[in-house]
Amino acid sequence: HIQRIVRKGELRVNGKRADSKDRLQAGQNIRIPPLRLDTPKVAGKLSEAGAKTLAELKAMILYEDDDVLVLNKPAGLAVQGGSGTTRHVDQMLEVMRDAKGQKPRLVHRLDKETSGCLLVAKTRFAASALTGSFRHRSARKIYWALVAGVPKPKQGRISTYLAKEESEDDSIMRIAAHGDEGASHAVTYYAVVETSATKLAWVSLKPVTGRTHQLRAHMAHSDHAIVGDPKYFNKENWELPGGLQNRLHLLARRIVIPHPRGGVIDASAPLPPHMLQSWNLLGLEADRFDPIENAPEE
């Protein structure tokens, strides 16, 4: 609940919106809105709308066992609620409560316009174990993107500091200096998989850290913004080849993470329709070897 009110900007420190990375100091004035404690819910007969939502979730499943779900989240569906967001994965998971009233829990997030692998814990035990794997960087995530131009060199490591920059209408992550207020270190490995002349490149990305908009900000910083990115890709200065949709071309392609009960979860998501259309139009081969597999672990 506390994380939710911080995310919504309802927690204030000295009159300003607090960030989850802020550290409190003695003498600061903290305002917390009245806590609305949820009463435990129990599983019951689903309504017609609930049954439809359950069918939608079932159609998204890439992997499932007693502890874990991996969903293929479609582009355009938010993971969690926020200002003006009424439909999101966290809310949809209400229909999957078990006989004890336990609802599956999110253990990480994807941006609304990013599609692909979203890991969900079905039990408290799994949630604790999976959250620990992310915290200790035992999880390996691979993303595919279509970017403007061709990065040089074709394989490399991007290491910067990122900080949130807010305006009245929006917020973005900007490149920051070490020591800047709110700045966090972000590291990404990238590899060019295939190119379409010199205009576009299919790039595989492996984030070491998990900062907000990290991959999107890093590719924009390298002058190879992800095609269709509404925050970091300036379409006015770049002409899309015919047939390509101006939508975010970013897929959470694969996740590899230790299973809470031993072994490994390894799930992959297919290209979403708008990216598959672009791959076909550009003659890119989706089954080509992905060189990011050889990127080092940190």
Regions picked out by a protein language model, each given a short descriptive name:
Residues 1-298:
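RNA pseudouridine synthases
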